[in-house]
Amino acid sequence: MTYPLLTRKTLMKKTPLALLLTLGLLQTPLAAFAATAPLDLVGPVSDYKIYVTENIEELVSHTQKFTDAVKKGDIATAKKLYAPTRVYYESVEPIAELFSDLDASIDSRVDDHEQGVAAEDFTGFHRLEYALFSQNTTKDQGPIADKLLSDVKDLEKRVADLTFPPEKVVGGAAALLEEVAATKISGEEDRYSHTDLYDFQGNIDGAKKIVDLFRPQIEQQDKAFSSKVDKNFATVDKILAKYKTKDGGFETYDKVKENDRKALVGPVNTLAEDLSTLRGKLGLN
């Protein structure tokens, strides 16, 4: 499914004023553009919307296959598809989280529910993860699978109509690293499947994409900052590469050595702190 409005070719046909309106850049106070002119943000924001749209299209496609396997009772296939499917959600989480109702339905963890796994509103990926990896069953999971697929399709529709706030886009890089620091390094995100490294990679890829798209604007303000961020991303990538499997996936998180977990803490926390200043550097606070 494609959205003509989101293609760069279509966007570039618009007048400068129309572009600013389409991408929400006139909703930002004029004082916010002390560091970066509004038109300088048009390209990065439009490209990021395309990136998010493409990832959500993949999310819908992969979720269809994942939920089909769950409904067929094919536990082995469902387990295999669980983590690779989630990557597409994790990479665009800052935008997905703008729809709090869907985020809670798609990605809430057992800790978010007072009644735990018995809670009626505990749905989505992690509820299916619990059934597949903790209980080793797909029994009675059909309705949850159907709801997950319905929710990601709803997300796709909402994102297509969304005006991307530039401050949310830029702030998303830090949000993704904070997510890694808070739940990925500890291994609590995917506690039943231990597939946290997939989520980890999705968060890192999403943050890198934002940095890369805004790189010209960042380097115009602070070239040393850009180099420091790249160095810390490279450190994280080097550690993650140790645990990649031949099929392009990752080892389970319980196989990550303690010294590597500790080695990830420094660069991840530094990235989260540094990227939290990015909005200010671009005048988007």
UniProtKB/Swiss-Prot annotation:
Gene Ontology CC terms: periplasmic space
Subcellular location: Periplasm
GO MF annotations, alphabetized: metal ion binding
Keywords: Ion transport, Iron, Iron transport, Metal-binding, Periplasm, Signal, Transport
Main localization, broad class: periplasm
Gene3D superfamilies assigned to the protein according to its UniProt record, in alphabetical order: M75 peptidase, HXXE motif
Domain of life: Bacteria
InterPro entries per record: EfeM/EfeO_iron_uptake, Imelysin-like, Imelysin-like_EfeO/Algp7, Imelysin_sf, Iron_uptake_EfeM/EfeO
GO biological process, one term: iron ion transport
Segment forming the signal sequence: 1-34
Oligomer and partners: Component of the iron transporter efeUOB/M complex composed of EfeU, EfeM and EfeB.
Entry's family note: Belongs to the EfeM/EfeO family.
Purpose of the protein: Part of the iron transporter system efeUOB/M involved in iron import. Specifically binds Fe(3+), which is produced by EfeB-mediated oxidation of Fe(2+), and delivers it to the cell inner membrane permease EfeU. Also binds Zn(2+) and Cu(2+) in vitro.
Written domain comment of the UniProt record: The peptidase M75 domain contains 2 metal binding sites, site III and site IV. Lacks the N-terminal Cup-like domain present in EfeO proteins that contains metal binding sites I and II.
PANTHER family linked to this entry: IRON UPTAKE SYSTEM COMPONENT EFEO
Protein name: Iron uptake system component EfeM
